[in-house]
Curated annotation (Swiss-Prot):
Organism per entry: Marinobacter nauticus (strain ATCC 700491 / DSM 11845 / VT8) (Marinobacter aquaeolei)
GO molecular function: rRNA binding; structural constituent of ribosome
Gene: rplX
Keyword DNA repair: no
GO BP term, example: translation
Membrane-spanning intervals of the chain: none
Quaternary structure, from the entry: Part of the 50S ribosomal subunit.
Key words, A-Z: Ribonucleoprotein, Ribosomal protein, RNA-binding, rRNA-binding
Family the entry assigns: Belongs to the universal ribosomal protein uL24 family.
Biological function: One of two assembly initiator proteins, it binds directly to the 5'-end of the 23S rRNA, where it nucleates assembly of the 50S subunit. One of the proteins that surrounds the polypeptide exit tunnel on the outside of the subunit.
Name this protein carries in UniProt: Large ribosomal subunit protein uL24
């Protein structure tokens, strides 16, 4: 089970986008995450008349290392660490380390 999943709200802890918040769009296999509005890059595209796409400069998100983001805890309003807890019925759930509340209930 991964500590950061798709649709989690995260805060960037280091880099040019430090202290910005965003929602995780995708978790890549190599330990990187794609976060909405974070680590924006400009891609120069050629026009393609076959597809009807115009050329120009397109701004899109680039992946960021998962170690450079922390999950956002809405109860404290700060970044938090994620831990795991096994319930009585044997299911494994993610919890916030500071409050011991389940992440998936938010």
């Amino acid at each position: 089970m991964k500590k950061i999943k798709r649709d989690d709200e995260v805060i960037v802890t280091t880099g040019k986008d430090k202290d910005k918040r965003g929602k995780v769009l995708k978790v890549l296999d190599d330990g990187r995450v794609l976060v909405s509005g974070i680590n924006m890059m400009k891609k120069h595209t050629k026009p393609n008349p076959m597809l009807g796409t115009p050329g120009g400069i397109v701004e899109k998100e680039a992946p960021i290392q998962a170690s450079n983001v922390a999950i956002f805890n809405p109860q404290t309003g700060k970044a938090d660490r994620v831990g795991f807890q096994i319930k009585e019925d044997g299911t494994k759930v993610r919890i916030f380390k500071s409050t011991n509340e389940a992440v998936d209930n938010q």
